[in-house]
Curated annotation (Swiss-Prot):
Main location: cytoplasm
Residues that bind iminosuccinate: H59, S80, Y151, A152, N153, S168, H238, P239, E240, T255
Organism domain of life: Bacteria
Organism: Burkholderia mallei (strain ATCC 23344)
Swiss-Prot/TrEMBL cofactor(s): [4Fe-4S] cluster
Swiss-Prot/TrEMBL catalytic activity: iminosuccinate + dihydroxyacetone phosphate = quinolinate + phosphate + 2 H2O + H(+)
Protein name, UniProt field: Quinolinate synthase
GO biological process: 'de novo' NAD biosynthetic process from L-aspartate
UniProt enzyme class: transferase
Pathway: Cofactor biosynthesis; NAD(+) biosynthesis; quinolinate from iminoaspartate: step 1/1
Amino acid sequence: MQSAIKSVEYDRPLAAGAACGVGEAWAKVPDALAPDERDALKARIKALLVREKAVLVAHYYVDADLQALADETGGCVADSLEMARFGRDHDAHTLVVAGVRFMGETAKILSPGKRVLMPDLDATCSLDLGCPVDEFSQFCDAHPERTVVVYANTSAAVKARADWMVTSSIGLEIVADLHARGEKIIWAPDRHLGGYIQKKTGADMLMWQGSCLVHDEFKGIELDLLRHEYPDAKILVHPESPEGVVALADVVGSTTQLIDAAVKLDAQRFIVATDLGILHKMRLAAPGKTFIEAPTAGNSATCKSCAHCPWMAMNALSNLADVLERGHNEIFVEAAIAQRARMPIDRMLDFAARHKQRVQASGDLQRDQALFANVGAA
């Protein structure tokens, strides 16, 4: 497999000109609240959402209080694909995106007439930071014969350079379709997800060498030891994880697919290799089942994330209330970039809608499950 670059950095400038590295992100995580403070803030936010004609769109990885608040107020808690669809289709005047910056940008691109706010504009993503648009554009220019496919975890400027945008829940299907049509691909930025898809589809993929700070820290050796400690447990793995971790999985899939697996599989215990923020929704969806965090560090080692994204952790009730009260932290995307970026996003959404119709028409649910099932050494 060819490589685009040898390494990436997590402390690079954002496309928008701001910067917030790992250390800065952890320093900006709001302090925990006392129960009475939390209840008061939730009541205040509910009133502000009504006043501002706003809806809360939250990712599975943010704080459990934010997820619960989104559910309680008619908002959305979902993966990035469903967040994009929900924000586009909802009639709210204001979308409040609890997640990371690329999610807010995508919401604005799909809903240019709506106001899009975020609790903290510095909440970014290591994959975004590791794929600066100027370097990526130069790489694409060097391979003009290839179709450019970028993961959702990229800036609007990088999406504007792409032919397709994908999420982990539909990326395999889209790449398989492109491969069937004989297209060669540039893939960015996550090398682990790209490698997983390449192995599943056999597609000719030239990889950008980015990685997710959280998933890159999961360890295959330690996971194998944990599996032997809990032999009855099923292992659920997000495909942004390293190959050695994916190889041990019973189910490999997006956040939504992992939650579905926790509900549908008859196991009572699961080892989960993704951001621990997902455990809130898993416990709600599968009450009575036990969820164990996969290890993120080896013997005597430390972890940068400890299975939780520092930028996701920057989202909290306190800064959400402040944003709604003051109307700041609004997302803007330059018109020319937004216009170009919308094309690959719309292509993905249209493909996903057609794929869903095909699956429903055929009733071929086993095929969908097989696409994200681990087969031996993945």
